[in-house]
Amino acid sequence: MTKIRIQVLALLALTSTLTYAQEDNKKGYLTGSFETNTIYYKDDSKTEAESPEDHFGSNNYLKLDYYQGKFAVGVQLEAYEPVLVGYPAELEKAKLTNYYVSWADKDFSVTAGTFYEQFGSGLLFRSWEDRMLGLNNAVMGARFTYNYKNIVGLKAIWGTPRFGMDFSDTQVRGIDVSFSLSEMLSWQNTSLSIEGGALNRYEKISIDLEEEGGKPYSNGFSGRVNFERSGFTAKGEYVDGGNKYYDFIHDDKLYAKKRANAQLLELGYSGNGLGINLTGRRLEWMNSEIIAGNGSTSNLLNYVPAMSTQYTYMLTNLHPHTPQTGEVT
């Protein structure tokens, strides 16, 4: 199958100003972007690969955000006419998928509608968008953040994650807290912080699973330590992902219960023209899903950080590594 690809990214410098009859004129402004990823497919006689029936695929995104002082409101329209080959099948047709309103100042913010968030490295929880992979698990609900003198940071979320073009029935509730000892003690050349998060996931379960002792909710938590001094960095994270239930027919049991957990350690040094990074981790049953048992590649509620470097402008650096949800590396 031969592909003729058209990629367009249009940044719309849309700026509108609203002036008030006050000494302090406050201005609002609008920003927007439009992206289309369109491919025309042709049959490939050499490989005998056949193109789709309509020979066409197009992923399109229109994003608009309006800012007025501490307030912001935004929408995102997506159209898959049809979705490109290899992308999740649940992405189809056109729909207003994301919309939000928020208020934020220096130390406090609140958002209602869709939002993205991450706890720690993302092993416990991450909602994000990656258009090249067809991923968007934005949460529809509410988010609250607070920062006290860069000493204490707090995030609290509640909502339902997006799956495909709609929002799932699964509910997530979580809180993440960071405490900076170095800021509290006014250390000049050292940074030390202790962080932790907790996440509750709720999804209705089948009668069979309930009869075998399954629960519709799972509770996970994480603990993290970050240290930096004179070019040296050290980061450690422990994650308990909560109970997972898997289809498992053995000894009259339909499901197997597993406890998800992970350990992550990152060490680094940068200075004097030298940079070194060492990463070690252990993962066990760390696949966190929006909809239990759904095999879609977009059915993700967390993120397993890659072990390989993330750039490919040098051929010698192109050694991709696919993260697994159960491994020691």
Predicted segment positions?
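Outer-membrane beta-barrel pore proteins
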Residues: 116-120, 146-148
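A short acidic, glycine/proline-enriched capping/turn motif at secondary-structure boundaries
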Residues: 82, 108, 117-119
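Phosphate/ribose-recognition catalytic cores of enzymes acting on nucleotide-derived substrates
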Residues: 98
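Signature for the C-terminal beta-barrel architecture of outer-membrane proteins
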Residues: 23-30, 35-57, 66-67, 71-73, ...
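Acidic, small-polar-rich N-terminal luminal/periplasmic segments of exported/outer-membrane proteins
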Residues: 94, 118-121, 127-129
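Bacterial Sec-dependent N-terminal signal peptides
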Residues: 1-30
